[in-house]
A protein has these predicted regions:
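RNase H-like, Mg2+-dependent phosphodiesterase core
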Residues: 1-195
Length: 195
């Protein structure tokens, strides 16, 4: 379907842009302003990469409980907004209402799937889909979340990563950008002696 979209985009007057957000940037957002602001910035970048056309209708899937606030935050960061006779609207579940937003969701999913394949190839083993329910992804954590650190291509702030660390590694869960604490447990609760 992705190929179909791009084959018909020009003649139909459709535009699309994807923005790749690295695990590091997601972790930094979680430590800082939060995911809502990261998503606002990503939409600003994607919209900024679109051709500036007259009478454009831009619809986003609201990533904020307040859809109007999400729209305003995006618009505020666009240096050349508003475009002539154009609208920018955010709605919850827009991918269920507007086919164009559903297509954008498919394009993003295809991009994510390619990134997971590239990660598997660069590591030399299958890391799965990257979703917490995927047994292959869970199994890959044994090779990606090591005692001496977490792989750079993994979201360190991901609840699945943190849970895996707490169940399988010692000490505090590492925080990206900070050196590991020198204070690590010297022994496990089930050991009566210091090792």
């Amino acid at each position: 379907i992705e190929r179909w979209f791009w084959n018909h985009a020009t003649s139909a007057g459709w535009y699309g842009a994807t923005v790749v957000i690295t695990p590091e940037r997601i972790d930094e957002a979680l430590q800082g302003r939060g995911l809502n602001w990261l998503e606002v910035e990503a939409f600003q970048t994607a919209i900024g990469n679109l051709p500036k056309t007259e009478s454009a209708e831009i619809i986003t899937d609201a990533c904020d409980v307040d859809a109007n606030r999400f729209t305003q935050r995006i618009a505020t960061g666009l240096s050349d907004w508003p475009w002539h006779n154009s609208t920018l609207v955010s709605e919850h579940k827009a991918d269920e209402i507007y086919p164009v937003v559903a297509m954008a969701s498919i394009l993003a999913k295809e991009e994510r799937d390619r990134a997971m394949v590239q990660m598997s190839e660069s590591h030399g083993f299958n890391v799965g889909s990257g979703y917490p329910s995927d047994p292959t992804t869970k199994a890959a954590l044994h090779r990606l979340v090591l005692q001496n650190g977490i792989d750079e291509q993994v979201r360190w702030e991901w609840a699945t990563t943190k849970r895996f660390w707490k169940q399988n590694r010692r000490g505090d869960v590492p925080v990206r950008g900070r050196k590991s604490s020198v204070q690590q447990r010297l022994f496990h609760e089930d050991e009566s002696r210091i090792s």
